[in-house]
């Protein structure tokens, strides 16, 4: 019974090997994240007599190369939440923080939790890949928003309000009607210098070429508004270049966002819980994969309260002696990305109001009681997660063991 504790960092790790009753098999030593370094670690672990289990923290992306290579060598590997390791066995007045001490602490954790350790597997790699894509998706969403605001700021000086003319959603390739319109009619003079009939014909041909729906009344409305607008920048080659560059940057970010959205859905469809999650109200091909990416493997949660605590939407507790606080904010100690996705799901439920959905009924009830926005949204997220946990766990338990 050998517990291998690995404190992972960028490019290298500290390893300690222990047995029960504090027996040190190998004092903390350093390995590099290279082929030779990992192979030497595998040989050392295999040379130690008895069963060995390896535990490491899933910190950032650093641990993945070790977890993957050690699993490929048919060793038992378990990647744990750093918070669980940090809170383990803190019974000393001294505060010691070093890589060597952390490696020993992880090894002691492995011994204490030996029977409950969950083995890292190929499905974990798929989930990690999905989570990485989701974080990239979030990054490019922020980038797209910044590029959109930048373009609108420039257009306010050449064609004020053009971004409000169309509200159609983005296409699968990321293109949007208002952006394509602004790329062609980048200055108000591009519209009002033509006669009404000439603009209608030009706009109709543009819609046909770009495969957008044409409306004559909309064309007349656009032309009428253009007559009243006052631009700041003149209609010249430099202004056109500035706008074209801003449009290209926004289109590039939009294309990346939509391709990631599609790729995430394809990857998420390989997970066993995919059909159950996609059947839930408020969840679609965009939010569903995001939920699965951030929640991960449901089987690692022992009960419903564990998954709500992981998301940070569980009610806080503040009691001491005879004092008991009645209204306590939620813990917010979990994943902020998961809370954001849950709030988006709640927003979809409020907008679509499916009357037969228990989460929407709960949200509607709390709103009717006059609860503040964040109170009923957080309470709804809590209820949604509990239902998610129950349905997914029940479905997974019904599947044949592989």
Regions found by a protein language model. Name each.
Residues 1-402:
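A detector of single, family-specific signature residues
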